[in-house]
Amino acid sequence: MKSERSYPIYKVNKKAEASLVGGHPWVYENDILEFPETEPENGTLADVVSPKGAYLGTGFVSLKSKIRVRLISRNANDTFDASFWRRRVEYAWAYRKTVLEPADLSACRVIFGEADQFPGLPVDRFNNILVTQTLSVGMEKLKPVLFPLLAEVLRADGQTIDGIYERNDEALRAKEGLEQSKGWFELPGESHPASTQTEICENGVYYHVDFENGQKTGFFLDQKYNRRAVARLAAGHTVLDCFTHTGSFALNAASGGAARVTAADISADAIAMAQRNAERNGLTNMDFLCEDTFELLPRLEKEGHPYDFIILDPPAFTKARRTVENAMRGYKEINYRAMKLLPRGGYLATASCSHFATEELFIKMLRSAAKDAHRQLRQIEVRQQAPDHPILWGVPETNYLKFFLFQVI
């Protein structure tokens, strides 16, 4: 039974109704049959109803985006006060404590946007700092309430939180009519740390994290257990880690007992950080190359280098459907070259972090690359993102990371 509260109402078509009933939280402007008589203020709440007027959910309105409403609740009796949001944060943190190993809680994703019913809000923890990206206008308006609650809930569980840093230098904010910026969020009555750098430990490997200038929030936490899987297989092998970024896979391979590891990246800054991380971990079985992988792999094949384990973890080659075809050509090229470079019996770890490069497309690409390289793929493992980046069924956008381990024969 619906409560007495009153929000503006959007009536949607059958297509949107089916999507919402199936679990997706987004309402696109093109799927709205009837708009409120008076358009609500940007970032405020509205109800969504079916073509027959049945309540479907309540969400934040975005007047600048093609996604007009992002649901936060499907309970018509919810009251969206501070207590509601505190419960949401507590629920998200309790989930992380359940699915992650205790040692991993100091560097983890605390909130994963829609998968935790905080649309457009990723929050990462790096020791005593929370780093956020506010990618929807609803979450932007909620910050004065929500961000202090994030610190309060974790502190109440005995966690040390000294500050919240905002990485809102993200182009997606423009689609919500939001400006780009970065800096400390001012928690009421508190000062923030002077430094925007910290150190984390993951799988026993230490990393320097620059959460002011690093990519995204400063470090990619979603591959933590995939890196561990690579370390387990790397012992005794000669490893090439392409797109190494700050060296995470390479460092895990080296610490896992690889005979030699070469870490390659096109960015000189990334290579410098990877070298710094190697030194911090006392790893001497590593070399570093600042080179484009698309040029590196053909060169190494021509020169006959003896790598028997290759890791491909590129950045997203596509962030839109219209560029998927070109992206798949890029994925095929690097995988084909890696398969050609590897000796028979060598190992390949290959990944894609693009939601639009679906698992079906990725598998099709791998089969094609193997055929052209005259190789067969013996599957060892198929993996996804770590569970602190949960996949919410009904929301395919949360299922983005593909990770395969093969023996190439």
Q: Where are the regions a protein language model picked out?
A:
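Mobile active-site "lid"/loop adjacent to the S-adenosyl-L-methionine
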Residues: 307-337
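Conserved SAM-binding motif I beta-strand of class I
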Residues: 260-265
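Conserved class I S-adenosyl-L-methionine
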Residues: 236-245
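S-adenosyl-L-methionine
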Residues: 269-311
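Conserved SAM-binding loop of SAM-dependent methyltransferases across substrates and taxa
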Residues: 246-259
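Non-catalytic accessory regions of SAM-dependent methyltransferases
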Residues: 1-127
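C-terminal catalytic and target-recognition region of SAM-dependent MTase-like enzymes
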Residues: 333, 347-409
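Non-catalytic substrate-recognition/targeting regions of SAM-dependent transferases
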Residues: 111-124, 143-219
